Curated annotation (Swiss-Prot):
It is found in: Nucleus. The keyword Lipid metabolism does not apply. Residues 24-98 form the KRAB domain. One of its GO terms (biological process) is regulation of transcription by RNA polymerase II. Belongs to the krueppel C2H2-type zinc-finger protein family. One of its GO terms (molecular function) is zinc ion binding. May be involved in transcriptional regulation. A zinc finger (C2H2-type) spans 227-251, 257-279, 285-307, 313-335, 341-363, 369-391, 397-419, 425-447, 453-475, 481-503, 509-531, 537-559, 565-587, 593-615, 621-643. This is Zinc finger protein 816. PANTHER family: ZINC FINGER PROTEIN, ZINC FINGER PROTEIN 672-RELATED. Keywords: DNA-binding, Metal-binding, Nucleus, Repeat, Transcription, Transcription regulation, Zinc, Zinc-finger. The gene is ZNF816. Pfam families: KRAB, zf-C2H2.
């Protein structure tokens, strides 16, 4: 009794200490709107409302945790001084439930913060008293804690019953408090600055200004404590042991979650949940536009931008926009030249991880994607998808300008440049322009003579990968492409497409100069050089020039004496494939070229052309000496020999 009276007198003597008791609830700092008022707010105002309300709730939780730390310290101090101090009661009241005054938009945010705060309290509850234990030597704070001070967890209702004079005494009296000021007072005040001005106003009006000047000073000093959890690897410190454990994963590369199916390991539970869907095939997120399903919500969000056309990610260098952030990151490497993904086998680097994975299949020879129709295997999933179209005949990519259809999107994009006139890739040697960088790279090998693709069987090298693939079929004899009309087989898809035009009589390529039509683009390009006189292919031995690379290749064999084409019947060899084909008709008796006038057949196309001049009376070969004309070149040569003999006789 004497001690209580002395305490009461000492309180009365100190000015500003006799403050009224009361409680502060979330309702006191909440800004309430009716449903009608809420509907009048625009999205920006609603977002601001949620941010302010959530900040006030955080501040009250901050005060709650800090006052508990003060009470624990007061109890510890009592073990040394012997004073009996009632630190007051701190409670949460269930009367102020979220649903009483909060809209559904706020519930989710506050519940989420409540869960995070519980995690913080559970993992780091010992931390606030760490510094005080060192000063007081106390080992058991729970023995001195008041039974009524344990907070009751509720969803939202937060109240404080505090005897403020005792709190003020806690601040001003005792050596331990001074030691605490010296050890912790130098820490940053940023945490207390986060308390909103509105919350300070409410507290000041309800309890008086001394509460802010006394209690919050101690709250600041206690909460801005040292970080007791330090990493032995790098020395980085954390407030809570859970954060330290998560940080250790970056050093040890440990993974907490392992897939039971494939053994892959992950450091977060949500990642393994996503990964499991790869095995189960579960796709829970569905697009309302096209019905396509996805395993992750983020994938669905990116997919929706295909329908809306939204491309929120913009390159600062060239202004190009993208629908995905990862696509922008990969695009930026084109400007920086960065290639962070390196092959361990050959040291080649790539700008994308997917490109590295595809490249590794070259070394391993792995082809995990198999066609169910013909059993052919592929190293890339996209290649298998394109291959499937060969069986179905589907061409899903259509040009809006001319209705041309294509198997691949890249082919369509390349075709569109014909309409736009775009030709951004220019050869520095001959100024020729191309629609893609791959075409330019292939063209430049004409000037450099580079042939990087080599056959493992015979050692022959090629400037194009497609040419090497075609050459391989000569060794294997494989001809996977069959004509449905006549059953003829081909080793290349392009050859089958060209062959189909023979049945259809289609000749889509037309010369603008003479209106002559062709079934192949290469034939049209070769024909155009007749009008322009261009002969870009030059022999390095005799400097003779030719209109096509095939003509140059045939001519080169004149110098080398090479005759790679052999007849299976008589073993006769030839330096040109066309001559071999003509020779083989001698054995087979085949005469595929027929005259429409008289029905006569020939085994060579040139023989048919010469015969048709008999019906047309055309004589295109003219002698420069006497002006006489002939139907065939051989006849002209024979005639010119007569003039030569006369000149010899005159001499």
């Amino acid at each position: 009794m004497l001690r209580e009276e002395a305490t009461k007198k000492s309180k009365e003597k100190e000015p500003g200490m006799a403050l009224p008791q009361g409680r502060l609830t979330f309702r006191d700092v909440a800004i309430e709107f009716s449903l009608e008022e809420w509907k009048c707010l625009n999205p920006a105002q609603r977002a601001l409302y949620r941010a302010v309300m959530l900040e006030n709730y955080r501040n009250l939780e901050f005060v709650d945790s800090s006052l508990k730390s003060m009470m624990e310290f007061s109890s510890t101090r009592h073990s040394i001084t012997g004073e009996v101090i009632h630190t007051g009661t701190l409670q949460r009241h269930k009367s102020h439930h979220i649903g009483d005054f909060c809209f559904p938009e706020m519930k989710k945010d506050i519940h989420h913060f409540e869960f995070q705060w519980q995690e913080v309290e559970r993992n780091g509850h010992e931390a606030p008293m760490t510094k005080i234990k060192k000063l007081t030597g106390s080992t058991d704070r729970s023995d001195h804690r008041h039974a009524g001070n344990k907070p009751i967890k509720d969803q939202l209702g937060l109240s404080f019953h505090s005897h403020l004079p005792e709190l003020h005494m806690f601040q001003t009296k005792g050596k331990i408090s001074n030691q605490l000021d010296k050890s912790i007072g130098a820490s940053s005040a940023s945490e207390s600055q986060r308390i909103s001005c509105r919350l300070k106003t409410h507290i000041s009006n309800k309890y008086g200004k001394n509460f802010l000047h006394s209690s919050f000073t101690q709250i600041q000093e206690i909460c801005m404590r040292e970080k007791p959890c330090q990493s032995n690897e790098c020395g980085k410190a954390f407030n809570y042991s859970s954060l330290l454990r998560r940080h250790h994963i970056t050093h040890s590369r440990e993974r907490e979650y392992k897939c039971d199916v494939c053994g892959k390991i992950f450091n977060q539970k949500q990642y393994i949940v996503y990964h499991h869907r790869c095995h189960t095939g579960e796709k829970t997120y569905k697009c309302n536009e096209c019905g396509k399903t996805f395993t992750q919500m983020s994938s669905l969000v990116c997919h929706r931008r295909l329908h809306t056309g939204e491309k929120p990610y913009k390159c600062n260098e060239c202004g190009k926009t993208f629908s995905e952030k990862s696509s922008l990151r990969c695009h930026r490497r084109l400007h920086t030249g960065e290639k962070p993904y390196k092959c361990n086998e050959c040291g080649k680097t790539f700008g994308r991880n997917s490109a590295l994975v595809i490249h590794k299949a070259i070394h391993t020879g792995e082809k995990p994607y198999k066609c169910n129709e013909c059993g052919k295997t592929f190293s890339q999933k996209s290649s298998l998808q394109c291959h499937h179209i060969l069986h179905t005949g589907e061409k899903p990519y259509k040009c809006e300008e001319c209705d041309n259809v294509y198997i691949r999107r890249s082919h369509l994009e390349r075709h569109r440049k014909i309409h736009t006139g775009e030709g951004s890739y220019k050869c520095k040697v001959c100024d020729k322009v191309f629609r893609s960088d791959s075409y330019l790279a292939e063209h430049q090998r004409v000037h450099t003579g580079e042939k990087p693709y080599k056959c493992n069987k015979c050692g022959r090298s090629f400037s194009r990968k497609s040419s090497l693939q075609y050459h391989h079929t000569l060794h294997t004899g494989e001809k996977p492409y069959t004509c449905n009309e006549c059953g003829k087989v081909f080793s290349r898809r392009e050859n089958l497409a060209r062959h189909h035009r023979l049945h259809a009589g289609e000749k889509p390529y037309k010369c603008e100069e003479c209106d002559k039509v062709f079934s192949r683009r290469s034939h049209l390009e070769r024909h155009r050089r007749i009008h322009t006189g261009e002969k870009p292919y030059k022999c390095k031995v005799c400097d003779k020039a030719f209109r096509s690379d095939s003509c140059l290749a045939n001519h080169t064999r004149v110098h080398t004496g090479e005759k790679p084409y052999k007849c299976n019947k008589c073993a006769k060899v030839f330096n040109q494939k066309g001559i071999l084909a003509q020779h083989q008709r001698v054995h087979t008796g085949e005469k595929p070229y027929k005259c429409n006038e008289c029905g006569k057949v020939f085994n060579q196309k040139a023989s048919l052309a010469k015969h048709q001049r008999v019906h047309t009376a055309e004589k295109p070969y003219k002698c420069n000496e006497c002006g006489k004309a002939f139907t065939g070149q051989s006849t002209l040569i024979h005639h010119q020999a007569i003039h030569g003999c006369r000149e010899t006789l005159q001499m």
